[in-house]
Amino acid sequence: MNFWKIFFASFAAIIVATIVSTFLLISMGVASLATFGLSEMHNTKNSVLCIDFAEDIFGSPQHSAVSSVDIMNMNYSQPLTLRQVLTAIESAATDPNIKGICIRPDGLGSVSMANLEEIRAAILKFKQSSKFVVAYADGYTQSSYYLASAADEVFLQPEGSFDWRGMALSTMFYKGLLDKFDIDVEIFRPTVCRYKSAVEPFFLTKMSDANRKQLEVLANSVWNTVCEDVAASRELKKEDVMRYAADLSISLSEDALRYGFVDRLIYEDELYNLFDSLGVERDSRGHSNDISLSEYITANSFAATTVTVNDNIALEFVDKPLMAVIYAEGDIVDGDDYVDGNIFGTSLAREIRQARLDERTKAVVVRVNSPGGSALASDVVWREMVLLQQTKPVVISMGENAASGGYYISAPADYIIANKLTMTGSI
């Protein structure tokens, strides 16, 4: 009897695995076929580049195709890297086929606030080309509006929504649940490390004073930056921008218009009429010539000047000699492997060593986006960073966060560069 249970369970697992694998292959095949003709699409004159956030935007290349699958919708969507996005916007500024940019933040892709800050800065630089930048949405979240506020004009659907209510950070606690099942958790945290709050949910039922303090500082810092940038772009007073959130003054489209957050309430067809007046042509079907960010990136093959050594290190041609770009993204863990969302200490140390020993490589940039993790793995990486810095110039570029072990592995560098929205420091 047990034999047949095991047999049918294994058979069912094989069937499911086959179906999922087939779906992935078909989806990737369709995606590949969809890229045919993109060069012709890009060559269409008088087009508008649409930043629609249909795909996730990561700080580094992803290792697995599984990360490109939306399990809920069973769709395949190739994620973009921040470098690709920034390069695309920079290229569009001098591309004679691109008349301007339209920010359409209605997609389901995700992007961190720190990456949004860099994309926003790229759009502000794009505006120096004298090409137009407009934003249109059925509704704005705080993060999407942060990007949209960089546009020359911001439009909202007449019945659209507008979320502007400040920042809040929360923590889920598990101790009550663990107690019900009579489960004890052994916590190893030095008493002086009271700001190391990652373990608090397992032995506390509410937020500690130390954690509340640091989260308040973090939230206030991020919100201050957002309001400061929005106020500067929209020519508003920062105090007013913050007060509107505190008073919950804006939720409807009319509110956003009244307080100067949007310029006009228009329908989508009116947006296309605006494109006409800005020199964007229409195709044979009467649709405005637009190209999505992912299509533009694929058509231009922005990664063509990169020689991929492995999934975590790329050698960029900067005339001659070479500059190595190493990605360190995720939790720092022990071991030797490549898995999205994790930095394996042995693997990253080997890549740093490779860049150090490679005679062609004259300088190294390490992109760090990590909250930390294993002390052992961090120390293994730190040692290789020290040896690298002794032989070649090293620059750290911090992404969304570089805290604890993430900062530890960054410390030996000659220069450390962070964004205003980067969460960094040794706790």
Where does each model-flagged region fall?
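PDZ peptide-recognition modules
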Residues: A245-A246, L252-A256, L265
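Amphipathic alpha-helical
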Residues: E268-E270
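Small-residue-centered hinge/linker elements
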Residues: M1-A246, I250, D276-I396, E400-I427
